[in-house]
Amino acid sequence: MAGFGLPNFGQLTEAFKKAKQIQQDAQKLQDELENMEIEGKSDDEMIKVWISGNQLPLKVEVQENILNADKEKIEKNILQAIQKAHESSTTTMKERMNDLTGGLNLNLPGFDNSDS
């Protein structure tokens, strides 16, 4: 520590370098998540949906033979596919954020920042 309880200039410079690197890595991660296509399928694979790593809906694929099913079955399949895609996307985002923030002990809500 330098005088007046402040870190020395070298430590401060290093902290700014780390902060800048984290900012660059975070932007790269944001771009990567935005360009991902994560698939979710209904249990019978009649409905498939794709969302980005940021959980934005991208596309839907419906097997033609499900269109003859009753309304409740179609709704159930759509919901299953959306839930699975969302779960995969959320897991992927958390893993990537942990990779970015691991070891920094930022204690971000919703993210496991431990070094386990």
From Swiss-Prot:
GO cellular component, one term: bacterial nucleoid
Record keywords, A-Z: Cytoplasm, DNA-binding
Major localization class: cytoplasm
Lineage: superkingdom: Bacteria
Stored InterPro entries: YbaB-like_sf, YbaB/EbfC
tRNA processing recorded as keyword: no
Disulphide-bridged cysteine pairs: none
Molecular function in Gene Ontology: DNA binding
Keyword Cytoplasm (UniProt): yes
Localization per record: Cytoplasm, Nucleoid
The protein's role, per its UniProt record: Binds to DNA and alters its conformation. May be involved in regulation of gene expression, nucleoid organization and DNA protection.
Assembly and interaction partners: Homodimer.
NCBIfam families: DNA_YbaB_EbfC (TIGR00103)
Assigned protein family: Belongs to the YbaB/EbfC family.
Protein's name in the database: Nucleoid-associated protein P9215_00191
Organism, scientific name: Prochlorococcus marinus (strain MIT 9215)
